[in-house]
Amino acid sequence: MKKWAIKAAILLGIIFLTNAVNAEGYMYGKNEVDLSYEKDCYLQQESPDWELMKKRPKVKGIYMTGYTVSMTERFNKLIDLVKTTELNAVVIDVKDDNGLMTYSSNLPDVGFTGANKNVRIKDIDAVMKILRDNNIYAIARIVTFKDRIAGDKYANLAVKNTSGGIWRDRHGMSWLNPYNRDSWDYLVDIAEEAAAKGFNEIQFDYVRFPTDGNVKIIDYGTSAAGKSKAEAIAEFLSYGRERLSKMGVVVSADVFGLVTSATDDMRIGQHLESIARSVDVICPMVYPSHYGKGSYGVAEPDFEPYKIVNRSMSIAKGRIDAMEDVSRKAVLRPWLQDFTASYLERYKRYGPAEVRAQIDATYDAGSEEWLLWNAGNVFTSGALLKE
């Protein structure tokens, strides 16, 4: 259904009255009102008004966890970094890799899952005011289908195994079923709430099918009949963009770096041209350390950051530019490596030269935007131009 946020008391009543509980979690209780979506296929839609895209800046950003935002000194240092360099944007976790909210959501369905149990950001409105006052473009990162909190609580939204139980990856994580439109609503409702808080852009991460674990025993159910994984992911993103564009926000999607050159969906539902029709911005994670030896003819990719990023982004831009059947196509904005991949057998220590090489490679490939990734939120200021 189109909207499914139900007051907690009503939801609990439905659950207990219908005994809709199984051993692995609550079944999401539906009412019988408005069970139809506006469209059968969300790939069949007009592109939203791109005035949003014309007004926004050429994004140059960094990533922040909820924990970093909650630590006043760390947060202020990063805000100062943005203010004193070419940076103009921040990506902030809203729903993290475990499915937990970083600030307290007012959505009853989210509260019922327990996703608010460990919020880091106590006053998101104050954070948003700081960003607005400093003219910093705010991007909400929402980890999408990887969600052990909602997947465990609402069993009927989760990916199942062939025995009918909740499927789990090799880390014990449950995932929301990308074919299930009710899981779409859980996610887009969170995105709409973030947009209402003042985020300029919603960035969907882990917007894919699971890969780790015994995927051979996955059963996606009847909703998967006759539909490819790539279609399911593209439809979800189109549906999200349709709802979010009405709120005046941009929609972006993170994709694996290899998506830029793979001609299929890599069995995860990420196909470049399909996603380019469904979002405003595509963010390939082109970290050199993540490429196998010999990729693009480079013996050790981690040692050649310029070559890997430039080649990846050049291929992606060429493919998107060649899409003659679409008048409006997604902008490319890569995630770049601002960390040292010390887990590799042989690795290069990344400093100002290596980070700047990736930025230059992005520009030389014809893209004008980029984001820096460091999981600990410690960024290489020496790689950035001063303002």
What are these regions, as identified by a protein language model?
Residues 106, 148-156, 197-228:
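Active-site-proximal loop/short-helix segments
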Residues 71-74, 80-85, 130, 172-207, ...:
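An active-site-proximal structural segment forming one wall of the substrate-binding cleft
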Residues 88-94, 120-166, 201-204:
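Glycine-rich, aromatic-flanked loop segments that form ligand/cofactor-binding clefts
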Residues 85-121, 211-218, 384:
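Aromatic-lined carbohydrate-binding/catalytic grooves of carbohydrate-active enzymes
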Residues 139-147, 203, 229-268, 326-339:
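Aromatic-lined carbohydrate-recognition surfaces of secreted/lumenal glycan-active proteins
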Residues 279-290, 305-310, 315, 319-387:
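Substrate-binding cleft of secreted/luminal carbohydrate-active enzymes
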Residues 50-69, 145-196, 356:
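Active-site-adjacent "subsite" loops/lids of carbohydrate-active enzymes
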Residues 76-100, 196-201, 281, 362-369:
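Catalytic domains of carbohydrate-active enzymes, especially glycoside hydrolases
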